[in-house]
């Protein structure tokens, strides 16, 4: 009798494990969710935005930790070391570089386009999202931050390279080959992204709790002014008074800060 009971229990266990096997095997790894199960709730978009911002800190930190090493390419400092963690600025300063040179040359290009790709995924899925757990203001805020990030990444590409591809949507098999765009087009895209973000964000300083950890309108105006300043001189080094006036007006419009007398 005991043997029969054991056989019945074993059979029941086998049937149970067989019927539940498919469910068990279909479990998606929580650490790396696929596109098919992502973008389902507000926290997914918050994670995606954080992931987009994380490209700014991607090793070796060409847009963050080692950004000060750009001074090695000026008269402000001298580079004694030539590792990637110094941007390979010694090699760049000597002119001994090619498209495969590591440091700033390759990492800036790679990280900016990786960041732009992440931003496009976020923007496209956010615009299509119909979930009730996200208000219209929250969606507008995230889209504005995504535009600000795209403009920020392109601002580095604009400053470090001459002509680069202008990608404004996720790449597919149909549009993966992108020709280089003119510097004027890249500059216009940066200004458009910054202006769109500035208009959509609440006009609060970074010290405000809502803006902590994000682009504020003031920060974007400062970044915009920096690029405008580089374009305010003619080929002979003479400043354009009209362009300079626009820059001053832009800086004076920053909330919570003011120009020194």
Annotate each language-model stretch with its function:
Residues 1-31:
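Bacterial Sec-dependent N-terminal signal peptides
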Residues 21-72, 98, 241, 248-252, ...:
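Membrane-proximal, proline-rich intrinsically disordered regions
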Residues 28, 158-169, 240:
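Short, well-structured active-site flanking segments
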Residues 36, 63-83, 167, 202-219, ...:
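Short, surface-exposed recognition loops and adjoining beta-strand edges that mediate ligand/DNA contacts
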Residues 46, 50, 54-60, 83-161, ...:
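Conserved, well-structured interaction surfaces
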């Amino acid at each position: 009798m005991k043997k029969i009971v054991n056989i019945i229990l074993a059979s029941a266990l086998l049937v149970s494990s067989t019927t539940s096997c498919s469910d068990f095997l279909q479990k998606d790894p929580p650490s790396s969710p696929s596109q098919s199960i992502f973008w389902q709730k507000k926290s997914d978009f918050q994670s995606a935005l954080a992931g987009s911002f994380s490209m700014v800190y991607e090793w070796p930190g060409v847009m963050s930790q080692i950004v000060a090493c750009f001074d090695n390419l000026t008269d402000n400092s001298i580079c004694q070391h030539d590792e990637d963690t110094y941007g390979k600025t010694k090699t760049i300063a000597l002119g001994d570089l090619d498209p495969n040179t590591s440091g700033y040359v390759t990492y800036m290009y790679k990280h900016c386009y990786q960041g732009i790709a992440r931003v496009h995924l976020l923007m496209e899925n956010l615009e299509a999202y119909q979930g009730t757990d996200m208000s219209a203001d929250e969606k507008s805020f995230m889209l504005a931050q995504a535009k600000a990030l795209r403009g920020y990444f392109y601002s580095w590409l604009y400053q470090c390279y001459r002509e680069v591809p202008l990608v404004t949507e996720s790449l597919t098999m149909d549009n993966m080959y992108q020709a280089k765009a003119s510097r004027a087009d890249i500059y216009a895209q940066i200004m458009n992204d910054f202006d769109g973000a500035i208009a959509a964000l609440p006009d609060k300083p970074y010290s405000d709790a809502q803006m902590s950890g994000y682009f504020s309108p003031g920060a974007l105006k400062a970044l915009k002014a920096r690029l405008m300043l580089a374009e305010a001189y003619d080929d002979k080094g003479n400043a354009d008074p009209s362009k300079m006036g626009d820059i001053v007006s832009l800086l004076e419009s920053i909330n919570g800060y003011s120009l020194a007398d």
